[in-house]
Swiss-Prot record:
A GO cellular component annotation in the UniProt record: membrane
PROSITE patterns attached to this UniProt entry: SQUALEN_PHYTOEN_SYN_2
Principal localisation: membrane
UniProt topology in membrane: Multi-pass membrane protein
Reaction equation(s) it catalyzes: all-trans-lycopene = gamma-carotene; gamma-carotene = all-trans-beta-carotene; 2 (2E,6E,10E)-geranylgeranyl diphosphate = 15-cis-phytoene + 2 diphosphate
EC number, as in UniProt: 5.5.1.19, 2.5.1.32
Gene: carRA
Pfam entry (one): SQS_PSY
Recorded family membership: In the N-terminal section; belongs to the lycopene beta-cyclase family.
Protein name as annotated: Bifunctional lycopene cyclase/phytoene synthase
Consequence the record notes for mutating residue 465 to T: In carA113; reduces the response to chemical activation
Length: 602
């Protein structure tokens, strides 16, 4: 005999524990709200409904198989309401999190199409509910199935109002999120019925079996309840995305309260796609297109962050990518590229002139001088105005100017200056975005954390330069190795694209000097990761350790590889270990450093 508590101990709780482990690195405060809200609603509505069902003897249990009974329902059944909700919502979150919800909000959809898609299913759900209500006569064969339909269909109709079109646009993920938990729970149900833990009355059901020991009504129950939970999860994700895109930029400097957050979510739930600003979403889409085309690795790697952090990091990186492309576009003359960068500087100054309120920028002044997709990225970038500091943005532009003017890196100070411009600035901006996107970061340590982020950016750039000595020489005729590290002949060879003629031993010596400096910087900088919001720590640690592993690869290599890198499998291993906590802290170069020694960064 299988007790109801054993059903939980052997089946539902282990699966829930596995899902919780898999999802833990991605858990955010938004998820906490989703779990609490959906579990509360599920428990509050399912409890009276299930008592009604058991009272009318549609469902029964083995008295010896339960721990206690509250009302007409076993304690374990109340547990099941919560466990089932957690299993389905967690699995749905794991399935859905890899793509931003904003990609499926489309204000350009024709109104007539939206009206049809929105209201025809609602009418269908409510019609089914009304007919089911009329058919739910106690002690009749349709009773149990009809009770399931009138319990579920009005909720489906309500949820369809706020997320119907959204779910149709990502129907594969929705169906998968419904199917897998349904199959698992039906299997558990079938197993328990076959062993007498509970049973379904033949008098109040159709008697149709989907599988042996699995009545049609039980299959219908799990299918429809899982559908409700997936619909609710999607509706919550869509509402959070709308609030983050349209409300959050206006409230960065306001104290958040739970009742205002709930009000905004209700407002967002009721918004049709057409009621939202199409330009805002099209600008975000244009920004992400830039990233998909220019940096598939960032596009993929960003998925380890929360929706909110990923959206804003994407906006930041899209701006960096667009400005970098402007500076590097060899189809445009250097004087014209300098003019474009001056336009960008003017935009940045305008953006930060008025610290609060919507930025008053005349975008027509950039048309014709800057590609439209880049202007869209700039418009999206304005949402970060209250998060970033102008100094870091201007510092990034100084780095582009350094490259455009082909300035020589004369000494270590120049190397640090250039690296700070193009990388420390980005590290600072990323940290400010992460701290603003999610509660839980240590804001009292913000200044120190930002300084360590700048150190980390510097370390990553030094690793980048160390890796690309030959590549930069061949492809750009450029060297970022300090001139005073080289002889006149070595400097000339690097500029002539003949870096290989320095020999493996010399290239390795130069590269490792930067790698060891980066390693020393990493040692302190990596400690600041623990001051970031919890949901961001694993992603940042993974990104940093992937780059650190490149330095380790250079250290271990025999000679100097043309471009040291990690294989896709190696990157996946590093990321998995960092995300799931198998690797923490500094993972740098181990062993004797030989002749190459780190230089001092002031």
């Amino acid at each position: 005999m299988l007790t109801y508590m054993e059903v939980h101990l052997y089946f539902t709780l282990p699966v829930l524990a596995l899902l919780a482990f898999l999802y833990k690195p991605f858990f955010t405060t938004k998820d906490r709200f989703k779990y609490i809200f959906l579990c509360t609603v599920a428990f509050a509505t399912a409890s009276p409904w299930d008592n009604y069902i058991v009272y009318h003897k549609a469902w029964s249990y083995c008295p010896e198989c339960v721990t206690a009974v509250i009302g007409y329902v076993p304690l374990e059944e109340y547990m099941f309401f919560i466990i089932m909700t957690l299993i389905t919502v967690t699995f749905t979150s794991l399935t859905m999190r890899w793509t931003l919800p904003s990609f499926f909000i489309r204000p350009e959809t024709p109104v007539f199409q939206s009206v049809c898609v929105r209201y025809i299913p609602i009418v269908g759900f409510l019609t089914i509910a009304a007919k089911a209500w009329a058919s739910s006569i106690p002690d009749s064969h349709p009773f149990y199935g009809a009770c399931i339909l009138w319990y579920v269909c009005p909720v489906l109709a309500l949820l369809w109002i706020g997320s119907g079109e959204y779910m149709l646009r990502r129907w594969k993920a929705v169906l998968f999120s419904i199917a897998v938990p349904t199959i698992f729970l039906c299997w558990v149900d079938q197993y328990a019925i076959a062993r007498g833990t509970w049973d379904i009355s033949r008098r109040t059901s159709t008697g149709i079996m989907v599988l042996p020991s699995l009545p049609l009504e039980e299959f219908l129950f799990f299918l429809l309840i899982d559908t409700v939970l997936v619909f609710a999860s999607c509706a919550t994700d869509r509402a959070h995305a709308i609030v983050h895109i349209y409300i959050t930029p206006m409230n960065h400097n306001k104290v958040s309260t739970w009742y205002m957050d709930f009000f905004y979510l209700c407002w967002a739930f009721l918004q049709t796609d057409q009621a939202l600003s199409g330009e805002t979403l099209s600008d975000l889409d244009a920004t992400w297109r830039i990233l998909r085309e220019a940096s598939a690795s960032f596009y993929t790697a960003s998925s380890v962050f929360s929706f909110e952090a990923r959206q804003d990091l994407g906006v930041l990186y899209g701006f960096c990518r667009a400005t970098d492309d402007l500076a590097d576009n060899n189809d445009v003359s250097v004087p014209d590229r300098k003019k474009q960068l001056e336009l960008v500087r003017g935009f940045v100054r305008q953006m930060f002139d008025s610290k609060h309120g919507h930025p008053d920028i005349d975008w027509t002044q950039y048309s014709g001088s800057i590609p439209d997709s880049f202007i869209a990225a700039f418009r999206s970038f304005t949402r970060l105005r209250d998060v970033l500091e102008i100094k870091a943005v201007e510092e990034l532009l100084d780095g582009y100017t350094f490259d455009l003017e082909q300035r020589e890196v004369k000494n270590e100070d120049d190397l640090v200056y250039y690296s700070a411009c193009v990388a420390s600035s980005v590290g600072e901006m990323c940290t400010r975005v992460l701290m603003a996107s999610e509660p839980g970061g240590n804001r009292t340590m913000l200044k120190w954390t930002v300084e360590r982020a700048r150190d980390m950016g510097l370390a990553l750039q030094l690793t980048n330069i160390a890796r690309d000595i030959v590549t930069d020489s061949k492809q750009l005729g450029r060297s970022y190795v300090p001139r005073d590290w080289l002889t006149s002949q070595e400097s000339a060879l690097l500029k002539a694209g003949k870096a290989r003629e320095l020999g493996d031993e010399r290239l390795r010596q130069i590269a490792l000097k930067m790698v060891y400096t980066a390693d020393d910087l990493n040692l302190m900088a990596s400690r600041a990761i623990d001051y970031l919001p919890p949901s961001s720590r694993c992603g940042v640690r993974a990104a940093c350790n992937v780059y650190t592993a490149i330095g380790v690869s250079l250290h271990k290599a025999n000679g100097y590889p043309d471009r040291a890198h990690l294989t896709k499998l190696e990157r996946m291993k590093v990321t998995f270990r960092c995300v799931y906590g198998f690797r923490k802290g500094h993972q740098g170069v181990q062993g004797d450093r030989g002749k190459s020694q780190a230089f001092t960064v002031i």
